[in-house]
Regions:
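Bacterial Sec-dependent N-terminal signal peptides
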Residues: 1-43
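Conserved Rossmann-like nucleotide-binding pocket used by diverse enzymes
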Residues: 27, 245, 269
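A non-transmembrane, solvent-exposed segment enriched in polar/low-complexity residues
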Residues: 31-177
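Short, small/polar residue-rich loop motifs at catalytic or cofactor-binding pockets
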Residues: 63-64, 243, 267
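Conserved hydrophobic/aromatic pocket- or pore-lining residues that grip, position, or stack substrates
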Residues: 195, 247, 271
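N-terminal "domain-start" segment that seeds a small globular fold
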Residues: 226-264
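Conserved redox-active cysteine motifs that mediate thiol-disulfide chemistry
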Residues: 267-275
Length: 275
């Protein structure tokens, strides 16, 4: 009787051990399946199975290949994992004709479409935000292209040409405004940071100062952001209404003199610089 109970108990323990091992194995597999990563799927208009698509980075206006995918059954797929969000390009070229779209490489499912009239990357937060801005810009570009083509009509009167030029200028302002609004809406994410670094010079000092204060801590030491901070601080220091910056120079006879030696001594101080 005792032997039977011992044997039964031993078999039960073995079953529990097997179940525990199986549970651990399933847990490991589950963790591996849940590991953060990206899957990029897309199509290219006019491409054939066997053609090559690349993920590339752009450095000093030059493309550098980072990954390769072969088109199969009309689609291409990239898989990998990112520990940070970066701007990259998906490119395709054949017989001298190429098409590309820049996007934000980040973990998640990203869908890409490359065609003559539609270049898009969507599916993740940063790419959706970027595509929203791109759609607005593309619409403006199309209107500008139509005006540019219409300007070639030799039958247009001077008044009609002036009207077209005015419309074109208004679209340029709309383009800048679309970028500005995109930056303001996304300044706390990689999309807004990238566009801000590209367009800050079009902003007022006040606008740049306000945007810089909203940039997340992990971007505060970015090389370009640091430069923009420096430029903005210098602009603030020399803005109208600010106290003058004192400096010292030598007179023609070699005597050192400061601006403060003259400011406040009369009604007006004129400082003339020449090279």
């Amino acid at each position: 009787m005792h032997k039977y109970l011992f044997t039964k108990h031993t078999k039960a323990m073995k079953k529990l051990t097997y179940l525990a091992v199986a549970a651990v194995a399933l847990g490991v597999a589950s963790c591996n399946n849940n590991k953060p990563g990206y899957v990029i799927t897309g199509t290219v208009e006019g491409a054939a199975d066997g053609d090559t698509v690349f993920i590339q980075e752009r450095v000093n206006r030059q493309f550098n290949k980072l990954d390769t995918a072969i088109i199969a059954n009309g689609t291409f797929t990239f898989e990998g994992a990112q520990d940070s969000v970066v701007n990259r390009y998906i490119t395709y070229s054949k017989d001298g004709d190429g098409v590309y779209v820049d996007f934000f490489l980040e973990n998640g499912k990203i869908k890409v479409n490359l065609s003559k009239d539609d270049k898009s990357a969507t599916g993740t937060p940063n790419n959706d935000a970027y595509q929203e801005i791109r759609n607005k810009i593309n619409a403006i570009d199309q209107k500008q292209a139509a005006i540019y083509q219409a300007m070639g009509d030799s039958t247009l009167t001077d008044d009609q040409k002036m009207a077209k030029q005015k419309e074109f200028s208004e679209l340029e302002e709309a383009y800048s405004q679309a970028i500005k609004e995109g930056v303001q809406k996304n300044i706390t994410n990689p999309v807004g940071i990238m566009l801000f670094k590209q367009s800050f010079y079009e902003n007022s000092t006040e606008d740049n100062d306000a945007l810089l204060k909203q940039i997340p801590a992990n971007y505060q030491n970015d090389e370009t952001i640091v430069k923009i901070k420096d430029i903005t601080e210098k602009q603030k220091a020399t803005a109208a209404g600010q106290k003058f910056i004192d400096f010292e120079m030598l007179t023609p006879d070699g005597k050192p003199v400061k601006l403060s030696d003259y400011v406040g001594k009369g009604k007006v101080v004129l400082v003339d610089f020449w090279a």
